[in-house]
Amino acid sequence: MAPTKKVPQVPETVLKRRKQRADARTKAAQHKVTVAAKNKEKKTQYFKRAEKYVQEYRNAQKEGLRLKREAEAKGDFYVPAEHKVAFVVRIRGINQLHPKPRKALQILRLRQINNGVFVKLNKATLPLLRIIEPYVAWGYPNNKTIHDLLYKRGYAKVDGNRVPITDNTIVEQSLGKFNIICLEDLAHEIATVGPHFKEATNFLWPFKLNNPTGGWTKKTNHFVEGGDFGNREDQINNLLRKMV
């Protein structure tokens, strides 16, 4: 009878490595499933928030229309609520610039031509806008304009660096503590001038826009005189469509 051959034993270190690799694969698979579930949950949350904001906007429009009709029926004038937020674009350079408007432009972070920022309209900012008026075009952005600026031209300030807002994670990491976790939240906070408007706008790097399609008309004249500078109220939306 032939002697039985011994099956060579697998070294213990090899077995340990195999187990470690198997455990690692299992953990990686579990992590992948967990991340996918969290991402799905977040996407649902983003969608619900966006829906909620759209409904709020529509309700506000309907209410405004109702009040206008009610006033007209009584023979009165309808006075809409005062605008709370402006978008300001620098349109002129620094040649022969007086120190006072230069300082005001720096305060508003409008350091270069075609830089743009959102500004909360109040007793502190309105005097600044009057000082810099010959050097800027400004007005009242609507919801669509705010969305277009954020989605097409939005950059964040992260650790002093200009970072493109490629996904909602960037927003959540910086503003999650204020319950602003996505671009829709950011747009809503700006449009409504929410309690964390300052944090929201400081998170954004000043927008860098193009010259308007077709060019400027006359930068040294006020908008009401057929020029470019100054408050153009709702017409700022037409200008920004040409610059985004």
Curated annotation (Swiss-Prot):
Example of a GO cellular component annotation carried by this entry: cytosolic large ribosomal subunit
Keyword presence, Transferase: no
Disordered: annotated span: 1-37
GO biological process, any: maturation of LSU-rRNA from tricistronic rRNA transcript (SSU-rRNA, 5.8S rRNA, LSU-rRNA)
Pfam families named among the record's database cross-references: Ribosomal_L30, Ribosomal_L30_N
One GO MF term attached to the UniProt entry: RNA binding
Keywords: Ribonucleoprotein, Ribosomal protein, RNA-binding
Protein task: Binds to G-rich structures in 28S rRNA and in mRNAs. Plays a regulatory role in the translation apparatus; inhibits cell-free translation of mRNAs.
Family, as annotated: Belongs to the universal ribosomal protein uL30 family.
Cited NCBIfam families: uL30_euk
UniProt name for this protein: Large ribosomal subunit protein uL30
UniProt source species: Caenorhabditis elegans
Taxonomic path: Eukaryota, Metazoa, Ecdysozoa, Nematoda, Chromadorea
Gene: rpl-7
